[in-house]
C-alpha cells in the first residue's frame, strides 16, 4: 500500500503520530508537484453491484469538499527513503519482520504461509518498503515506483515529517474522479481506449493469468499512463492508497 498526500492544513493535528518525528525543513515540499482543486459538491459512492456499503462505497450521496491541494503522484520509494534517512524511522513491516507479497512475485519455494481467504497473498520474511518482494532492493531497482508495505501509521508519520496530511476519503474520491460524475474510471466507463489499457491493474483471469507485460505485472512508475482531468496520475490501479 502506498499513500498520497494533501498539502499542509494550518492547524490540523494528528494525535496518533509519534511526536519524536520532527517536520522536515523542506517547507516547500514538492509544491510544484501538487494540484490545487477547487472542491465543491459531487456525487460520492456507487450503486454498482460490486461495491461494499460497509466501507462507504455506497450508496451514492451528495458530498461537499472544501478547496484542497493533493500531490500529482503517489509517494515514491525514493521520496520515502529521504524520510527514513533523515528520521531513522522504522516502519511497522520492519518491526514485525515480514509483510504480505503477491504470490507471482515469488519463487515457488518462497510461497509458504498465506492468507486463508486470499491465498495469493504470501507472508514473506523481511518484505518491507525497501524490499518489496523480500529480496530486490527498492531504492536501487524501483526508485520511481510507489512505496509499498506502508501501514496507516507509517503514512501518518511520513505526512508529519513532510508537513502534509492524508486526504479524507471524500477528498480522495473527488480527486480520483477528475471532475467526471459517476463514471467507473477517471477517463470514462470503458477500461480500454483504442484497445489500450489505461491503468496498471491485473489483466486477465485473477489470480493466475496476468497478461500484462512484464514491466507492469506488479507496480509501475508513478507517472505511468495519462493523468486524469485534474492532472493526477494513477488514481486507479497500481497500489491501494491510504486516506484519513
Name each region found by the language model:
Residues 29, 67, 158-160:
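Short hydrophobic "helix-edge" motifs at membrane interfaces and signal-peptide entry regions
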Residues 37, 43, 47-48, 90, ...:
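Functional-site microenvironments in short loops/helix caps that host divalent-cation chemistry
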Amino acid at each position: 500500500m502506498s499513500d498520497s498526500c494533501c498539502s499542509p492544513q494550518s492547524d490540523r493535528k494528528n494525535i496518533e503520530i509519534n511526536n519524536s518525528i520532527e517536520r522536515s525543513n523542506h517547507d516547500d515540499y514538492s509544491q510544484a508537484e501538487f494540484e490545487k482543486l477547487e472542491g465543491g459538491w459531487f456525487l460520492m459512492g456507487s450503486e454498482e453491484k460490486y461495491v461494499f456499503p460497509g466501507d462507504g462505497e455506497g450508496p451514492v450521496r451528495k458530498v461537499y469538499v472544501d478547496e484542497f491541494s493533493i500531490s500529482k503522484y503517489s509517494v515514491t520509494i525514493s521520496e520515502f527513503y529521504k524520510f527514513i534517512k533523515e528520521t531513522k524511522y522504522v516502519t511497522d513491516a520492519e518491526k514485525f519482520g515480514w509483510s504480505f507479497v503477491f504470490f507471482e512475485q515469488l519463487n515457488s519455494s518462497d510461497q509458504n504461509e498465506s492468507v486463508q481467504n486470499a491465498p495469493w497473498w504470501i507472508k514473506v520474511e523481511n518484505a518491507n518498503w525497501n524490499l518489496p518482494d523480500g529480496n530486490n532492493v527498492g531504492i536501487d531497482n524501483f526508485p520511481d515506483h510507489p512505496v509499498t508495505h506502508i501501514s496507516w501509521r507509517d503514512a501518518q508519520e511520513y505526512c508529519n515529517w513532510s508537513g502534509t496530511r492524508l486526504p479524507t476519503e471524500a477528498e480522495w474520491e473527488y480527486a480520483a474522479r477528475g471532475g467526471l460524475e459517476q463514471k467507473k474510471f477517471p477517463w470514462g466507463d470503458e477500461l480500454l481506449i483504442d484497445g489500450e489499457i489505461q491503468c496498471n491493474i491485473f489483466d486477465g483471469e485473477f489470480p493466475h493469468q496476468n497478461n500484462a507485460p512484464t514491466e507492469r505485472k506488479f507496480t509501475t512508475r508513478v507517472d505511468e499512463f495519462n493523468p486524469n482531468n485534474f492532472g493526477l496520475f494513477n488514481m486507479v490501479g497500481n497500489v491501494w492508497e491510504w486516506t484519513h
